[in-house]
From Swiss-Prot:
PROSITE patterns: FUMARATE_LYASES. It is found in: Cytoplasm. Belongs to the lyase 1 family. Argininosuccinate lyase subfamily. GO terms for cellular component: cytosol. It comes from the Bacteria. It is an enzyme of class 4 (lyase). This is Argininosuccinate lyase.
Amino acid sequence: MQEKKLWGGRFSESTDAFVEEFTESISFDKELALYDIKGSMAHAKMLGKQGIIPQEDAEKIVKGLQDIEQEIKENKFVWKKELEDVHMNIEKALTDKIGKAGGKLHTGRSRNDQVITAFRLYLKENTQDIINLLEDLQRKLLEKAKEYIDVVMPAYTHLQRAQPIRAAHYFLAYLEMFQRDKERFIDNLKRIDMLPLGSGAVAGVDFPIDREYVAKELGFSQIMRNSIDATSSRDFALEFLSNCAICMANMSRFSEDMIIYSSSEFSFVELPDKLTTGSSIMPQKKNPDVLELIRGKTGRVYGNLISLLTVVKGLPLAYNRDLQEDKGPVFDSVKTIKGSIIGITKIVEGLKLNREKTQLAAGGFALATDLANYLAEKGVPFRQAHHIVGSIVGYLVNQGRELESITLEELKQFSHLFEEDALKLLSPFVVADRRKSFGGTAKEQILSQIEYWDKILNK
């Protein structure tokens, strides 16, 4: 038997089965159930307080919603596709439970402002969760920086060895990136944390409602000033998806680093066994599946951003049913980014650096820049110094030798300005600690950065 539509008074025919199947959103928007109930309870309390409905009915509504909330939490609630969405399912269940009083809940409210209120409550909570997860990740990166401050490794440009750095400098680089990600989400909260309820379908409400009361009940810091904007705008969700995409890009870069560094060709990093998988045929394999999936899921989040941008780009004001398609991309991105941050955090916490391998790789021709700087400090124009040291590198490469093997006599063949102290520059630790500029890889700079982040993250 087909359920009677709550909006069916104007129609002479039952809804076609195809339309019910095509337009339903309950298969995914039940994610909003608890947020919808929270919004409805605040609305009901306000209706009773304002005398718009009898206080007794308001109390019945709140009690009925609390019962439904418990059923949902216990997975006992029966969802009906023919009731279209989460909001209609809950309202119908409420009316069945408490009778005519349930029909008064929708007084002074439209599904348009109801839906977007639940959506904002959902996004507000999950954005704060993401901020907290990012901060936990930052703490793990800070711990790794402290653990490996006395380990050197090569920094890469073009995936070629560039210059030696302290490993702590590498971990602090990602800590900085995730700080900006976190700040973007924090800033996004300002535009999420706005109450749309009370805007009605599009033009406002002709009952003496108290939006300030509802905002306080629901914990919103602001009330949206324009009813058209409140019910039809999704820029806050687009901003959220953009932030997710940028954050996923940073996590994908870290994942790529770890995939490369944990390969046998590099062997810089040992990943925890419990966070890797094996092969069905090759017994020696230790696959970085978590990292690979984070790298792969990044494209999925990009797609979600493009999906919603495409939905909203041609919509006239105000609400259009197209906006039903805002939920899927956001729900999927929330699940994806939260899982990815947790995965990266576990990887960071459990990884171990191979000190011997990283130190060996940090030497060699990665030290060449400092020989050029040595000559520049003695008055040689840097471009000329660069050419001289390039000739030294070519000389050694042709002999199959590393830079550390060169003697002072050989250096003097290329420039008489080389002295005994130039040989000290053939140590990656010495070279790293020459980078004393603010933000550099010298130990004194790294200790200063660690002190700074300790105050920020562990206050």
